[in-house]
Every structure is written in C-alpha cells, then in structure tokens.
Regions:
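Bacterial N-terminal signal peptides
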Residues: 7-16
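Positively charged n-region of N-terminal signal peptides that target proteins for export
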Residues: 1-6
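A "functional boundary" signal
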Residues: 20-211
Length: 211
C-alpha cells in the first residue's frame, strides 16, 4: 500500500512538473505544494523548486512561496543559513488580516533563526507567532511553537523558561492526543533536567519518553 501511494505521488509530481513546463502557472504549483506539504514535504519541495523566477511572483504568491519553501525545508531538516527568503513573507504579512499566514511567517522565520543560532531573534518570532495564531492552526502549530521556544531557552541556559515551555507543549499534546508530540515534550523535559545535572530526574523522563 505504501509503495502504491509513493508511486501515485511520484506520478502526480511528474504530471505537475510537466504542466508547469507546458504553460501551467505558479499559482497551481503553490496550491499543489500546499496540499502535499503535511504528508509529503519532499514532493512539495520538488514542486516549489520547479517554479522558475520566484522573485517575479506577485506579492502574496511570493510571500506564500517563501513560507511554503521554508516549511518544506524545515520538515525535511534542511539547515537554513539566511533569513532573506522568509523575511519577505514576514514583511508582507505582518500588517495583514490573514493571521494564519502571519503566524506561519513568524514561526518559520523563528525556525530559520534557530538554525542560524540567533536565539534571541528566534524567541521573539516564536512569541509573536503565539500572539497571532488562529484557533484553526493550533493543532499543527501550537505545541511546535512551545517546543521550539523550549529549545531556544535551553540553548540560552534559561532552564526555568525551557522547562515551562516543554510543560506547556506537553499539556497541549495531551489535549490533542498527539503521541509523537508527547514523546518530544517528555524527552525535552528530561534533557533540561540533564543540563542542570539532575540526572535522576532526567532518567525518569527519558524512561517515560520510551514507554
């Protein structure tokens, strides 16, 4: 079944790329990439990278392209070394009424700053994302924002803040019944205990993460 699904996605990708070269437009590719993003970020990334001259896109499309491309790279653990792309999306959406895109722009710029080891800037963007996150986006993003905040605080030796953020993520993932999120939150709590040389407590939480 998984092999068949991969084949279908691959065929869809080939047809999409062909459509692009045969006169299809960037708007279609952006919609297709967005629909594939959550389950197939590698396919979404391929579609986005097939868009020629993204700098010529209209304002909203260029901003969405920046968000989608950064999202795909983040999901595939591609390290970012510059904020120039996602900064355009933040500048475009920061005065917009579209809170979902505004939140995504701040969140993914925060992820880029975390990659760049600019923890102060990352924290500011994650906190801004929390301020504007709409209810319908909480399932995908709320726990992730707190987990990223926790990671930034831990890097800055702000262990109390890191622990608080991990516990917030833990509460959220329990309510959402997201087992994968719970694993990362519990493991994160253990990691913060380890950083504080509280090894017994760290071991307890690492064991909980494995259970």
């Amino acid at each position: 079944m998984k092999l068949l699904l991969s084949y279908i996605i691959g065929l869809f990708l080939i047809l999409s790329l062909s459509a692009c070269h045969d006169g299809g437009n960037a708007t279609t590719l952006l919609h297709q990439a967005d629909s594939l993003m959550q389950e197939f970020p590698d396919s979404a990334l391929s579609l986005l990278e097939s868009i020629s001259h993204p700098e010529k896109l209209s304002g909203s499309e260029r901003a969405d392209y920046a968000i989608f491309l950064t999202r795909a790279r983040t999901k595939l653990y591609v390290h970012e070394s510059s904020d120039s792309l996602i900064r355009f999306a933040v500048d475009y959406y920061k005065r917009s009424w579209n809170n979902e895109r505004k939140m995504q722009a701040y969140y993914y710029r925060g992820c880029v700053y975390r990659d760049m080891r600019c923890m102060d800037l990352a924290v500011k963007d994650f906190l801004q994302a929390l301020k504007v996150i709409p209810k319908e986006s909480e399932y995908l993003y709320l726990g992730a924002i707190y987990e990223n905040l926790a990671g930034c605080y831990a890097e800055q030796n702000l262990y109390k803040d890191a622990m608080h953020a991990h516990h917030k993520a833990h509460e959220i993932y329990i309510k959402q019944k997201k087992d994968d999120g719970l694993f990362y939150a519990v493991r994160g709590i253990g990691y913060v205990f380890m950083l504080q040389h509280q090894l017994d407590s760290a071991l307890v939480y690492y064991q909980k993460a494995l259970d």
